[in-house]
């Protein structure tokens, strides 16, 4: 079974921040699926199951996301992990896909890499870069950024549904957005 993980931070103060685009995409996906909500304490996150995959929003805060991913992956013996995350090295509105590689300094990916290895698939959503990286990723999207955000999330949603039935190379060639 496939595990789709959206990275983000829990708490209302982090809702709609750049670091939470993974959570945002999971929420969009769940709106279009029939899902059962599973235990959240055992897996340190909100876990949902559909006929296509498990969907996880870790509740460990970003730096410990790997604990939640490992708990679900080990318990359900997931043979495929797809992680959705923000990427400051990509311009706002950019959408890219890859397998493995470095964390690029992303603490959520570092945590997953440390506990699960790095051979998982990644859906990278560009949020742009600022001199103060922490304030930038923990900042909310500006009004003028909403159109780009909505566009990339809709494209990523279509890509994810296809990715669950296909491979990342095919999806990348069809759905990547370069900004």
Curated annotation (Swiss-Prot):
Lineage top rank: taxon: Bacteria
Matches recorded under PROSITE patterns: PEPT_TRNA_HYDROL_1, PEPT_TRNA_HYDROL_2
Keyword entries, A-Z: Cytoplasm, Hydrolase, RNA-binding, tRNA-binding
One Pfam short name: Pept_tRNA_hydro
Annotated GO CC locations: cytoplasm
NCBIfam families membership: pth
Family recorded in the similarity comment: Belongs to the PTH family.
Protein name as catalogued: Peptidyl-tRNA hydrolase
Originating organism: Campylobacter lari (strain RM2100 / D67 / ATCC BAA-1060)
């Amino acid at each position: 079974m496939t595990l789709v993980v959206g990275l983000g931070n829990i708490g209302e103060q982090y809702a709609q921040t750049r670091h939470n685009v993974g959570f945002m995409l999971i929420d969009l996906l769940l709106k279009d699926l029939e899902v059962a909500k599973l235990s959240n304490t055992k897996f340190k996150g909100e876990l949902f199951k559909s006929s296509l995959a498990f969907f996880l929003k870790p509740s460990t805060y970003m730096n410990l996301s790997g604990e939640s991913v490992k708990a679900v992956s080990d318990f359900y013996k997931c043979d495929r992990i797809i992680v959705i995350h923000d990427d400051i090295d990509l311009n706002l509105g950019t959408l890219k896909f890859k397998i493995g590689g470095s964390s690029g300094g992303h603490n959520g990916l570092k945590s997953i890499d440390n506990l699960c290895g790095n051979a998982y698939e990644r859906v990278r959503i560009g949020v742009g870069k600022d001199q103060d990286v922490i304030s930038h990723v923990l900042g909310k999207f500006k009004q003028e950024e909403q159109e780009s955000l909505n566009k990339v999330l809709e494209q990523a949603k279509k890509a994810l549904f296809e990715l669950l039935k296909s491979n990342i190379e095919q999806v990348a060639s069809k759905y990547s957005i370069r900004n």
